[in-house]
From Swiss-Prot:
It comes from Xenopus laevis (African clawed frog). The lineage of its organism: Eukaryota, Metazoa, Chordata, Craniata, Vertebrata. InterPro entries: Ribosomal_mL52. Belongs to the mitochondrion-specific ribosomal protein mL52 family. Component of the mitochondrial ribosome large subunit (39S) which comprises a 16S rRNA and about 50 distinct proteins. One of its GO terms (biological process) is mitochondrial translation. Residues 60-86, 110-145 are annotated as: Disordered. GO terms for cellular component: mitochondrial large ribosomal subunit. It comes from the Eukaryota. Keywords: Mitochondrion, Ribonucleoprotein, Ribosomal protein, Transit peptide. This is Large ribosomal subunit protein mL52. The keyword Ribonucleoprotein applies. It is found in: Mitochondrion.
């Protein structure tokens, strides 16, 4: 059986090449008719799970020194002007920090309100017990004999 040259170091038999040609032709025919199914699921980039599990960014270009620091500076030592992406990321971080502070203060305020309410409920319960009617024949009463 004659072997056909494919690429450096690889040779294919005629039956394999025939099979590949048939599959290629069928896929082209399917794409022309529009019956080919299209997947719409989200793609997971290579290594994304590994980076997320270790606490890194999902991609290497989200944040970090290579993304956040300027590529150059002036010869006299002045910093380079910030890029649009750097400005946008800085604004996003500031907005996130403001939201964290807002939610933290709301949480603290909610906790103080809850503690006040608990104290008021305890005081009210104590007041109810004090104002209850007492029985005349109390067991603590000592008799003089």
């Amino acid at each position: 059986m004659p072997l056909l040259y494919c690429c450096p170091g690889f040779y294919l038999s005629s039956s394999v090449t025939r099979l590949l040609c048939v599959r290629l032709r069928n896929s082209v025919d399917l794409s022309r008719t529009g019956n080919r199914s299209v997947h719409s699921s989200t793609l997971r980039c290579a290594g994304q799970d590994w980076r997320v599990r270790r606490g890194f960014a999902r991609s290497g270009s989200e944040y970090g020194p290579l993304t956040d620091l300027p590529d150059w500076s002036f010869a006299d030592g002045r910093p380079a002007p910030p890029w649009k992406g750097q400005i946008r990321r800085k604004e996003e971080r500031e907005a996130l920090a403001r939201r964290v502070v807002l939610l933290s203060t709301e949480m603290d305020q909610g906790m103080t309100n809850w503690h006040k309410k608990q104290q008021e409920m305890k005081a009210e319960q104590l007041q109810k017990e004090i104002s209850k009617l007492k029985s005349k024949a109390s067991p603590n009463k000592t008799t003089n004999t």
